């Protein structure tokens, strides 16, 4: 496990939860995750769940993705997706508004790995360098990804070579995120 990335993710999650507490006097609330089982759920309303991050359980790697492509995935990606269970968190990096993706449960972790595999299949078909997404943007065809060759974090337009480097590594990127509520 990459300790710098794990700590940066935990620190951002704490900043996010603290900001939520400050503004709403509660743990984060999600309507999107209502009805989806998770160890993160503290309580449920008629149409939403309150959640708090929980330690990840299970194998702490994305080896299914590695096996599918017979490649080695950046250690920071293993760490990013296996440090904790949590709800997705809205954030800002500079002037970029994003939703930081998280695994909600062990079932969700399997789904995330399947989506990462699908993403890599498309990139391979289009002969694009491999990236692994970590966040979504309002523009559907743009994501924040980690380049699997360099470990750099970039803003990427899906299906194209258009990439803008944002940070030299994932820990640096996470440390610069500001919570958005």
Curated annotation (Swiss-Prot):
It is found in: Cell inner membrane. It is a peripheral membrane protein. Keywords: Cell inner membrane, Cell membrane, Membrane. GO terms for cellular component: cytoplasmic side of plasma membrane. The keyword Glycoprotein does not apply. InterPro entries: Syd, Syd_sf. Pfam families: Syd. The keyword Membrane applies. Its main location: membrane. Belongs to the Syd family. Interacts with the SecY protein in vivo. May bind preferentially to an uncomplexed state of SecY, thus functioning either as a chelating agent for excess SecY in the cell or as a regulatory factor that negatively controls the translocase function. This is Protein Syd. The gene is syd.
